[in-house]
Amino acid sequence: MSLQIRRATLADVDALSAIAIATYNETWGDSYPPQELDDFLQAHYSSEPQRIELSDPRSAIWLLMEGDAVVGYLAAGANTLPHTDAREGDIELKRFYILAAHQNGGHGARLMDAFMTWLDQPQRRTLWVGVWEENFGAQRFYARYGCSKVGEYDFIVGDTHDREFILRRP
């Protein structure tokens, strides 16, 4: 079955929360103590934070669909990354996850292309991305879209501080 991409709506809150939690667990679940991970997921990926994000006119989320099932997503919104060059109106790619069973089929590039079309309408906007310092595949992927490293910051889950690179496409 071919995978489809569509924009998320408020009706997708629960499905978005479910895929956000599932993909974060699949990708990073072994990286944090269980209670700290659960607290983080509830604070950031449960239904209410998703509802708030979807209600924000500066945010946009795309869903990767296999029939009626969400198998991936990309979320963007107002930039919150800590960098002195960040400006009002800049956009941050906040989350970009696809279930492992659906990776390496070109679907990530399709999601990114849909996002980039939105990002640059009606005019080109600056893109910011935070990526883990050891996620070399993601760094190469974002470089193909014109992003380069401009800084670093700590991404915090519980008591764990992960070094993240700040990437920017001017």
Language model regions located:
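Acetyl-CoA-dependent GNAT
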Residues: 3, 7-13, 17-32, 38-101, ...
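Active-site acidic-Proline motif in GNAT/NAT acetyltransferases
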Residues: 99-101, 105, 133-134
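C-terminal "cap" of GNAT-fold acetyltransferases
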Residues: 62, 87-91, 125-139, 143-170
